[in-house]
From Swiss-Prot:
Keywords: Antibiotic, Antimicrobial. This is Antibacterial protein LC3. The keyword RNA-binding does not apply. GO terms for cellular component: extracellular region. Antibacterial activity against X.campestris, especially strain G, and P.solacearum PO1. On a 2D-GEL the determined pI of this protein is: 9.12. The keyword Phosphoprotein does not apply. It comes from the Bacteria. One of its GO terms (biological process) is defense response to bacterium.
Length: 28
């Protein structure tokens, strides 16, 4: 859940800085 998920979500996460910060930290 930290490899394929980050890759797929990383696409839309890059667009949303707000969500990125929050989601990136969780997956990272």
């Amino acid at each position: 859940a930290s490899g394929g998920t980050v890759g797929x979500y990383g696409a839309w996460m890059r667009s949303x800085s707000l969500v990125s910060x929050s989601t990136i930290t969780t997956f990272s």
